[in-house]
């Protein structure tokens, strides 16, 4: 079990770590996940430190870096890393079974351009990622907190948009996706109001799913049931 934190901010836009009144029961790691954590973490794992990491040192090369917040079980992240060996990928996930599953899949796929954090994403972004160092930040299917009284817990808020902007290089892209239409509207409102961004949609709203974002099994099932998915892409200018 681990405490669950939520991205809340004060009036000045300062991130506040707040612990909700329940704990998340993560479930036990499978044998394969535990083995991957033991064998692959020394290779692909990044231990959190409160100072900026050197991406060239971490990956052993200079290349554009893509960072994904909350990669779940990691299947799509591994697929993207395998499809784009010229890019560096960093994934951040708080659920240990997901980290183990991602490491196992990455090892099986022979991926070498992926590193992962098992830590709070906001803390990693604030303290470990240098300003202007990322080519892309991906936030796919974050918790929608669909009840109105919980909307303040949504990770996409004005201070979060500014935090991401500060980590992107000029020309870098913040790519968001959600299967909740109300959350897509919230995302669009926040991002359109955020300074230093340009919406990549020709119509000023959402974009078609780009080929580089794999269609997940969950998403494919949603399409069959008539559920929508909304992608937003904003460029740092």
Swiss-Prot record:
Please name the SUPFAM superfamilies in this protein's record. S-adenosyl-L-methionine-dependent methyltransferases
Q: Which reaction does it catalyse?
A: guanosine(46) in tRNA + S-adenosyl-L-methionine = N(7)-methylguanosine(46) in tRNA + S-adenosyl-L-homocysteine
Q: Which PROSITE patterns match?
A: SAM_MT_TRMB
Molecular-function GO term, any one: tRNA (guanine(46)-N7)-methyltransferase activity
A single cellular component GO annotation: tRNA methyltransferase complex
Report the EC code(s) recorded for this entry. 2.1.1.33
**Binding of S-adenosyl-L-methionine: at which residues?**
68, 93, 120, 143
In terms of InterPro entries, this protein maps to: SAM-dependent_MTases_sf (IPR029063), tRNA_(Gua-N-7)_MeTrfase_Trmb (IPR003358), tRNA_methyltr_TrmB_bact (IPR055361)
Q: Which domain of life is it from?
A: Bacteria
UniProt keywords, alphabetically: Methyltransferase, S-adenosyl-L-methionine, Transferase, tRNA processing
The metabolic or biological pathway listed in the UniProt record of this protein is: tRNA modification; N(7)-methylguanine-tRNA biosynthesis
Major enzyme class = transferase
Where, by residue number, is the active site? 143
For the ligand (substrate), the binding residues are 147, 179, 216-219
Extract the PANTHER family matched here.
3-DEOXY-D-MANNO-OCTULOSONIC-ACID TRANSFERASE/TRNA GUANINE-N 7 - -METHYLTRANSFERASE (PTHR23417), PENTACOTRIPEPTIDE-REPEAT REGION OF PRORP DOMAIN-CONTAINING PROTEIN (PTHR23417:SF14)
Protein's job: Catalyzes the formation of N(7)-methylguanine at position 46 (m7G46) in tRNA.
| Similarity section | Belongs to the class I-like SAM-binding methyltransferase superfamily. TrmB family.
- Give the protein's recorded name: tRNA (guanine-N(7)-)-methyltransferase
């Amino acid at each position: 079990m681990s405490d669950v934190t939520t991205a809340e901010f004060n009036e000045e836009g300062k991130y506040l770590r707040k612990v909700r009144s329940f704990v998340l029961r993560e479930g036990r790691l499978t044998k394969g996940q535990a083995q991957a954590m033991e064998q692959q973490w020394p290779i692909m794992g990044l231990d959190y430190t409160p100072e900026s990491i050197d991406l060239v040192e971490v990956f052993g090369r200079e290349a554009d870096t893509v960072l994904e917040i909350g990669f779940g079980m990691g299947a799509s992240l591994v697929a993207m890393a395998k499809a784009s060996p010229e890019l560096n990928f960093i994934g951040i996930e708080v659920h240990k079974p997901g980290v183990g599953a991602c490491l196992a899949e990455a090892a099986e796929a022979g991926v070498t351009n992926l590193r992962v954090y098992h830590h709070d994403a906001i803390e990693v972004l604030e303290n470990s990622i240098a300003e202007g160092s990322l080519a892309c930040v991906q936030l796919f299917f974050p918790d929608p907190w669909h009840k109105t009284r919980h909307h303040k817990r949504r990770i996409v808020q004005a201070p979060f948009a500014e935090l991401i902007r500060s980590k992107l290089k000029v020309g870098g892209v913040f790519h968001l996706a959600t299967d909740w239409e109300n959350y897509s509207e919230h995302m669009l409102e926040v991002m359109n109001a955020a300074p230093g961004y340009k919406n990549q949609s020709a119509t000023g709203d959402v974009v078609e799913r780009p080929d580089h974002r794999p269609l997940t099994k969950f998403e494919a099932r949603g399409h069959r049931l008539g559920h929508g998915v909304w992608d937003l892409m904003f460029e740092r200018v």
